[in-house]
Structures are given as structure tokens and as C-alpha cells.
């Protein structure tokens, strides 16, 4: 579940994710299908699929809230159990430029992916992450800079085939899309 509330993803609703029972959330339909729990996804994906996962409260800022850090730790523990002690083979830890959870993920052996926006690139240490995400519509100058890092790049958030082509033409090595079947090159 991406957003804190269902407002954007399920029009006509306004349910807070943190306090709505799963018995209610599981009945809702987004544009891509029903809401799913991480464990349901993990149980269904083939062994060759790699997931990009972020812990929302610790991925976007320098988090110091004890409860949020404990929740992140529980997620790390779940992933360790779910993937037989080697989640780093199946999970990329996704963060944002100001997030500090990458260091904790790297200490556990995870590859990391930062989702950046053009204004963040000048101050970013592009060598800090294993994969760099950038808006598909960013300028050629921005794409040239992140491509020069030598890291794989992911264009976000792609909603149609034209955007996918534009991003790939700028050097993106991968695409992040809500509807992969609509944008697969």
C-alpha cells in the first residue's frame, strides 16, 4: 500500500491505512487490482522476481522516532525469515534522497535504490546508492549526470509507452510503472 490514505488510489474513499482493518482494505479495488499484503505478494512471486521495498516512515527522512525504527527492524526481520535468511538476493531497499535507512539496509547486505527528483541531484552523492531512480521527464542534463554515475537507473513513474520510450532514450536501464502491461517496451 503506497499512500497513507485510500483517497487517491480508490476514488470515493478516504480511509486511513493505519487504522482501517484489513478486512475492509482487502475489499477495495485500485486501478491495478486489489490491495495486497506484503506476505501475500511474497507467497505468490516466482523465485526470479526481485522486489523494491521501502519502509515509508524511515525511507524519506533522517528518522529518529523509536517506534518507526522498531517497525523498520520488524520489516527487516520479516524479510529475513520470508527469504530464508538471504533477503538481499530478492529485495532492493528503496529510499528517497533524505532517507537514512540505506545505511541500515546496506549493513544487512541489501542493495539500495534512491528515488531522486531533478532538484535533488546537484547535492546528491550518487555513489551512495546502488541504483538511481529519476523522473522520466527530467532534463537530458540531469539524466546525463545520473548515467555518468555508472549505476543502473530506473525511470519513474511511467504511465504509458511514450514515457517509457522517452526514459529509455535518455539512458534509463529500467522502468517503474503502476501498470507494467501498459508500458512494457
Regions found by a protein language model. Give the residues of each.
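Solvent-exposed loop/turn segments at secondary-structure junctions
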Residues: 4-7, 49, 56-61, 97-100, ...
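Structural detector of well-ordered beta-strand residues that form the stable sheet scaffold
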Residues: 52, 92-94, 113, 154
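Alpha-helical scaffold elements lining the catalytic groove of polysaccharide deacetylases
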Residues: 65-76, 125, 131-136
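C-terminal active-site rim and adjoining tail of enzyme catalytic domains
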Residues: 113-185
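An active-site metal/cofactor-coordinating segment within enzyme catalytic domains
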Residues: 1-50, 55-58, 62-65
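Boundary/entry segment of secreted carbohydrate-active catalytic domains
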Residues: 3, 111-113
Amino acid at each position: 500500500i503506497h499512500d497513507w490514505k485510500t483517497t487517491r488510489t480508490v476514488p470515493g474513499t478516504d480511509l486511513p491505512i493505519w487504522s482501517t482493518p484489513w478486512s475492509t482494505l482487502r475489499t477495495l479495488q485500485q486501478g491495478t487490482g486489489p490491495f495486497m499484503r506484503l506476505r501475500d505478494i511474497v507467497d505468490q512471486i516466482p523465485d526470479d522476481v526481485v522486489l523494491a521495498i521501502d519502509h515509508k516512515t524511515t525511507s524519506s527522512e533522517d528518522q529518529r522516532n523509536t517506534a518507526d525504527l522498531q517497525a523498520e527492524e520488524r520489516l527487516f526481520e520479516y524479510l529475513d525469515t520470508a527469504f530464508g535468511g538471504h533477503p538481499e538476493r530478492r529485495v532492493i531497499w528503496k529510499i528517497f534522497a533524505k532517507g537514512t535507512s540505506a545505511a541500515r539496509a546496506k549493513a544487512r547486505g541489501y542493495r539500495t535504490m534512491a528515488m531522486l527528483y531533478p532538484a535533488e541531484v546537484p547535492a546528491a552523492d550518487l555513489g551512495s546508492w546502488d541504483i538511481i531512480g529519476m523522473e522520466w521527464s527530467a532534463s537530458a542534463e540531469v539524466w546525463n549526470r545520473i548515467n555518468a554515475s555508472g549505476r543502473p537507473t530506473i525511470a519513474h513513474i511511467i504511465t504509458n509507452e511514450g514515457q517509457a520510450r522517452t526514459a529509455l532514450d535518455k539512458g534509463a536501464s529500467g522502468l517503474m510503472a503502476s501498470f507494467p502491461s501498459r508500458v512494457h517496451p
